[in-house]
Regions:
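N-terminal Rossmann-like FAD-binding beta1-loop-alpha1 element of flavoenzymes
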Residues: 3-33, 38
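Core beta-strand elements of the Rossmann-like FAD/NAD(P) dinucleotide-binding domain
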Residues: 4-6, 167-178
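Conserved structural-core and active-site-/substrate-pathway-adjacent residues in large, well-folded domains
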Residues: 10, 21, 31, 57, ...
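Short hydrophobic core segments
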Residues: 11, 123, 173-184
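Active-site-adjacent segment of FAD-dependent monooxygenases/related oxidoreductases
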Residues: 45, 49-134
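Conserved FAD-binding catalytic core of PHBH/FMO-like flavoproteins
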Residues: 133, 178-219
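General small-molecule cofactor/ligand-binding pocket signal
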Residues: 142-144, 197
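A conserved short coil-to-beta-strand element within the FAD-binding core of flavoproteins
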Residues: 145-160
Length: 219
């Protein structure tokens, strides 16, 4: 007999895993979330939360927590294309174009007519702790950071998983009807045979995390 028996095992404690835990709890479905890292992300990652996302957060009692710490719409409601943020060269610090975006400025009434929820701007490094708190409040003891899935066996009725408590250096067995692979698609998703269809490698993108006083660029 397994040490833990739950309807759903969630592997991964990022945005997807934590929201899955919250939503299942709201539906009265018991789950266990395991995340191999000791804490939520230390990197900003994604930051824009559109109106539909905020509607779902509102439905599950999360929206107010996000709005309380998110960037006010008046501070992110424009998009500006520039050659650079600074520099003294002839092509530095030039603005190509500026437009309202994300429901700010001239777009406010249009966006407000579509939804009772405005969009928000909160980097993942600050969003995930909020989601973790809501998940833990709804499922005490069932959101386990520092616990890593190390093996699983699937059968007709579900999965039997082996989870390692990394701090205690011990393992335990979990039996679940369903397992959600919310680990970012680079580990257990591959082992499950989940593949991406269609063209890949369409473009390269680079994220840069920096601190700067950008007040000179704000209208």
């Amino acid at each position: 007999m397994a040490d833990v028996e739950v309807p759903v095992l969630i592997v991964g404690g990022g945005g997807c895993g934590l929201t899955a835990s919250i939503f299942l709890s709201e539906l009265g479905v018991e789950s266990l979330l395991v995340e191999r890292h000791e804490s939520t992300s230390h990197l900003p990652k994604a930051h824009y939360l559109n109106q539909r996302t905020m509607e779902i957060f509102r439905q599950h009692g999360i929206a107010d927590s996000v709005y309380a710490v998110g960037t006010p719409l008046e501070n992110f409601g424009k998009v500006r294309w520039r050659t650079s943020l600074g520099g003294d060269g002839p092509l530095d610090a030039r603005t190509f174009y500026t437009m309202d975006g994300f429901g700010g400025g001239s777009l406010y009434d249009l966006y407000a007519a579509d939804s009772p929820c405005l969009s928000s701007n909160l980097p993942q490094i600050r969003l995930e702790p909020i989601l973790r708190r809501h998940a833990e409040d709804r499922a005490p003891g069932r959101v386990r950071f520092g616990h890593e899935l190390v093996a699983f066996v699937e059968d007709a009725e579900g999965v039997t998983a082996t989870v390692q408590d990394r701090a205690a250096d011990s393992t335990y067995e979990v039996r679940a009807q369903y397992m959600i692979a919310a680990d970012g698609g680079k580990t257990w998703s591959e082992k499950l045979g989940v593949t991406m269809q269609g063209p890949s490698g369409l473009l390269d993108m680079v994220s840069t995390h920096f601190r700067a006083d950008l007040s000179d660029y704000a209208d």
